[in-house]
C-alpha cells in the first residue's frame, strides 16, 4: 500500500507559469514493436547534467532534513539524510519517458503501457515518476520547477501539487535517473522526466548529451490517424529504392513521424517488384506496381515503375581454390541486384619457379 501511495503522489505534472527564456538513431526499450504497435522516429536531442542534477537534489534533501520538513506526518532530521545516487538504468527509462511525454504531456505512454512497465535495474521497484516542461535546454530547470512546490507543501496549501518535491526529499528514495529531451516540435521544447527507486545496488554510470537524433519510440497503432508514403517513383531492374512511411498522431498534433518498423508492406505484383518489411523495393522486371503500407486501419499506397535492366556491378569471392588436380570456383555477386554467377578457374597445369635470392650466414645467394 505504501508503494501505491508513493506512486499516486509521484504521478503529478508541472508546467511553467512564466514567460519563455528561449524558444544518431537511439533504440527503444524493446527490440521489436509489441502487438498492435509500431516504432516511429522522434527527432530531438538529450541533454545531460547528471552530476549537477544529483548534487542539486541532494542539496534539497539535506535542506529538508535540516529544516524538519515533514514526510508521512513525521519531521525529518539530519539523521534521516541519505544522499541519493544516480542510476544508469533509471536514466535510460527516464530518457524514454521524456521523449514520450514531450508528446503526451502527461503520465501516459504512446504504446498504451504503464509508465512503470519497464525492465528495471537490480531488484528494486520504482516509487514515483515526476515530469516537467519548460523552454530551457537545461536539466536543472525541471528540478527547480519541482523544488518550487516546497512552499505550498510546507504550508499545507489545499489542492496544491507537491508530489515532485516530496519525491526528491523522501529518504526512502535512494536512486534517481533523470532524462531531458529537447523536442522542437513539442508544445514545450524541454521535457524533463525522473524516476525514483528505493533500495538495491545499481550501476551509476552517467550518459552523455546527444546531438540531434532519431529516438525510437513505440506507438500504439490506434494513436495513428493518417499515414503518407514518399520516395522514388521508379527503379531499374535489379536495383533498390527505399520508400518512407510517415504517420501523424492526430490526438497529439499534426507532426508526422517516420515509421521504422511494424507496418505491413505488400506489392500488387511480386513478379515485377518485391518489398521488404521496412519499405525497401527491389525491381525485378519491367512493369508498374502498387506498393501499399498498412498500420492498423490506416494505409497508404505508392505507384512504382520498374524500368530497364540492371547494369551489373560484380564483386568476386573465391569459394574453391584451383590446384594442379582440380578446377577452382569464384562466386560473383552483383552489388546492385544480388544476382549470382560462378566463374570456373581451370586447374593449374604447370608451375614455374622464377629466380629467387636469399641470405644465409650474412651472404646473399641466387638460385
Stretch-by-stretch model annotation:
Residues 202-221:
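A short, surface-exposed interaction/processing loop segment used at functional sites
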Residues 11-26:
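Sec-dependent signal peptide cleavage junction
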Residues 221-350, 357-367:
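Extracytoplasmic soluble-region selector
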Residues 2-14:
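Bacterial N-terminal signal peptides
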Residues 24-123, 165, 171-176, 180-181:
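Short, well-ordered surface patches within globular domains
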Residues 115-206:
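A well-ordered secondary-structure block
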Residues 69, 138, 184-190, 252-257, ...:
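Short, solvent-exposed loop/turn segments that connect beta-strands within catalytic domains
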Amino acid at each position: 500500500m505504501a508503494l501505491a501511495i508513493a506512486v499516486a503522489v509521484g504521478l503529478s505534472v508541472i508546467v511553467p507559469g512564466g514567460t519563455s527564456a528561449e524558444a544518431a538513431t537511439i533504440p527503444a526499450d524493446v527490440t521489436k514493436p509489441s502487438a498492435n504497435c509500431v516504432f516511429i522516429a522522434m527527432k530531438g536531442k538529450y541533454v545531460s547534467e547528471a552530476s549537477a542534477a544529483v548534487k542539486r537534489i541532494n542539496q534539497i534533501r539535506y535542506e529538508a532534513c535540516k529544516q524538519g520538513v515533514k514526510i508521512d506526518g513525521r519531521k525529518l532530521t539530519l539523521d534521516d539524510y541519505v544522499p541519493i545516487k544516480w542510476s544508469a538504468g533509471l536514466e535510460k527509462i527516464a530518457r524514454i519517458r521524456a521523449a514520450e511525454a514531450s508528446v503526451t504531456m502527461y503520465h501516459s505512454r504512446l504504446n498504451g503501457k504503464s509508465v512503470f512497465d519497464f525492465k528495471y535495474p537490480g531488484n528494486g521497484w520504482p516509487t514515483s515518476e515526476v515530469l516537467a516542461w519548460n523552454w530551457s535546454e537545461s536539466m536543472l530547470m525541471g528540478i527547480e520547477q519541482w523544488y518550487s512546490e516546497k512552499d505550498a507543501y510546507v504550508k499545507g496549501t489545499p489542492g496544491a501539487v507537491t508530489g515532485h518535491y516530496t519525491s526528491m526529499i523522501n529518504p526512502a528514495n535512494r536512486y534517481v535517473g533523470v532524462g531531458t529531451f529537447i523536442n522542437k516540435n513539442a508544445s514545450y521544447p524541454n521535457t524533463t522526466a525522473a524516476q525514483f527507486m528505493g533500495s538495491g545496488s545499481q550501476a551509476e554510470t552517467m550518459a552523455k548529451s546527444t546531438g540531434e537524433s532519431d529516438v525510437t519510440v513505440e506507438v500504439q497503432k490506434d494513436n495513428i490517424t493518417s499515414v503518407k508514403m514518399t520516395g522514388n517513383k521508379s527503379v531499374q531492374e535489379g536495383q533498390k529504392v527505399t520508400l518512407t512511411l510517415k504517420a501523424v498522431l492526430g490526438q497529439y498534433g499534426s507532426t508526422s513521424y517516420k515509421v521504422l518498423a511494424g507496418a505491413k508492406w505488400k506489392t500488387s505484383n511480386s513478379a515485377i517488384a518485391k518489398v521488404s518489411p521496412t519499405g525497401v523495393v527491389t525491381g525485378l522486371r519491367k512493369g508498374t506496381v502498387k506498393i501499399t503500407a498498412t498500420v492498423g486501419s490506416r494505409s497508404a499506397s505508392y505507384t512504382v515503375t520498374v524500368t530497364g535492366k540492371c547494369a551489373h556491378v560484380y564483386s568476386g569471392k573465391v569459394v574453391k581454390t584451383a590446384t594442379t588436380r582440380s578446377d577452382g570456383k569464384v562466386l560473383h555477386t552483383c552489388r546492385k541486384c544480388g544476382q549470382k554467377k560462378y566463374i570456373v578457374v581451370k586447374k593449374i597445369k604447370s608451375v614455374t619457379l622464377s629466380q629467387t635470392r636469399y641470405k644465409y650466414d650474412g651472404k646473399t645467394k641466387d638460385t
